[in-house]
Amino acid sequence: MAGHDSGNAKRGRSPSFGVFVRKPVERTSAKGTSDGAVDSQAIRIDAAQSWPDDAVEVGAVVDAYGLKGWVKLAAHAGAGRGGDALLKARDWWLQKGAERKFARVTQAKLHGDTVVAHPDGSVDRDTALALRGARVFVRRGDFPALAADEFYWVDLIGLDVVNEAGVALGKIADMIDNGVHSIMRVEYPATGKDGRPKTGERLIPFVGVYVKAVEQAAGRVVVDWEADY
């Protein structure tokens, strides 16, 4: 997958760590906003398609594309990486304001640094424009499969981080892409200079020289990193 580090952690080189979306979003409650609601006639709705438990936000509709109902989307991690799920998944869930809809996508493809797609039932530019501003979710189960040493950000956020001595370093609160590799933003309980509790932060590069194991079943990442770094 483009943009990944290569190699194998067991050989002391940087493993190929995959990236995807920013972080999990609220999956069960819809909060109203001032941006309006998706036009009920804009996309074909299947009442049986309820909001999935493993829905992950992967992008947003930013504009119409052409005159035949296509939409242009911004993928949260860039079309070459975050766009992979937008290209593969044919079932999308859209949220605009407080309203949620299901859309079956008939076609999707890369277009420059964006993704363009055609939701079934979107017949013209006006219909597509009605979807502008909608957040796009897909099922986690519809993400493309990764190699054994690749990971999606959404699966890493929330994992505990410990060093090789077993010292707890905190929990992954977010992932950052610095253009070269991913970085774990690890939060941990700390005490401020005034003696009050605060949230401390560690930034640990997600590369093989520091990351020694990702144990998803155990809910943790093992790193070569000291607590006083």
Curated annotation (Swiss-Prot):
GO cellular component terms, A-Z: cytoplasm; ribosome
Keywords from the UniProt entry: Chaperone, Cytoplasm, Ribosome biogenesis, rRNA processing
A Pfam cross-reference name: RimM
Single GO molecular function: ribosome binding
SUPFAM superfamilies, per database record: PRC-barrel domain (SSF50346), Translation proteins (SSF50447)
Chain residue ranges for the region called Disordered: 1-37
Transport keyword on record: no
Disulfide bonds: none
Main location: cytoplasm
Cellular localization per UniProt: Cytoplasm
GO BP of this protein: ribosomal small subunit biogenesis; rRNA processing
Residues annotated as domain PRC barrel: 148-229
Domain free text: The PRC barrel domain binds ribosomal protein uS19.
Family: Belongs to the RimM family.
HAMAP family linked: Ribosome_mat_RimM
Subunit structure of this chain's protein: Binds ribosomal protein uS19.
Function: An accessory protein needed during the final step in the assembly of 30S ribosomal subunit, possibly for assembly of the head region. Essential for efficient processing of 16S rRNA. May be needed both before and after RbfA during the maturation of 16S rRNA. It has affinity for free ribosomal 30S subunits but not for 70S ribosomes.
Name of the protein: Ribosome maturation factor RimM
